[in-house]
């Protein structure tokens, strides 16, 4: 038996990809702000070449999550998770938080020079 598709996996994938996309730039800044230093912080930029892949994966996952979350409630069977208004509202909130993370990942390299 397969579990019903409710968009949770796509939201998780989008959030994870957004975090990975900004890890190369945001990680060193956070560590420096917390007082950590050292030459090993430069090794965190090893993810930089993969940043476009992570951003692309995040955008694709967000597209599928958007399709699943913003479909009409009539498309859900009665008793399904997507038919409950509180769950739909929570998923929409999480979706927009993850979308904001992706926007931060997209814009962070352009804003980062102002912090260093």
From Swiss-Prot:
It is a multi-pass membrane protein. GO terms for cellular component: plasma membrane. It comes from the Bacteria. GO terms for molecular function: mercury ion transmembrane transporter activity; metal ion binding. Its main location: membrane. It is found in: Cell inner membrane. Keywords: Cell inner membrane, Cell membrane, Membrane, Mercuric resistance, Mercury, Metal-binding, Plasmid, Transmembrane, Transmembrane helix, Transport, Transposable element. Hg(2+) binds at residues 24-25, 76, 82. The keyword DNA repair does not apply. The chain crosses the membrane at residues 16-36, 46-66, 94-114. It holds the Pfam family MerT. InterPro entries: Transprt_MerT (IPR003457). Involved in mercury resistance. Probably transfers a mercuric ion from the periplasmic Hg(2+)-binding protein MerP to the cytoplasmic mercuric reductase MerA. NCBIfam families: PRK13751.2 (NF010314). Belongs to the MerT family. This is Mercuric transport protein MerT.
């Amino acid at each position: 038996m397969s579990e019903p598709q409710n968009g949770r996996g796509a939201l998780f994938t989008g959030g994870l990809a957004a975090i990975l996309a900004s890890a190369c730039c945001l990680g060193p800044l956070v560590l420096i702000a917390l007082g950590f230093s050292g030459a090993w912080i430069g090794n965190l930029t090893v993810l930089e070449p993969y940043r476009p892949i992570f951003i692309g994966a995040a955008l694709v996952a967000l597209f599928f999550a958007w399709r699943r979350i913003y479909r009409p409630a009539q498309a859900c069977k009665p008793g399904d998770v997507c038919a409950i208004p509180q769950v739909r509202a929570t998923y929409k909130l999480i979706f927009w938080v993850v979308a904001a993370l992706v926007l931060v990942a997209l814009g962070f390299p352009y804003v980062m020079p102002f912090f260093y």
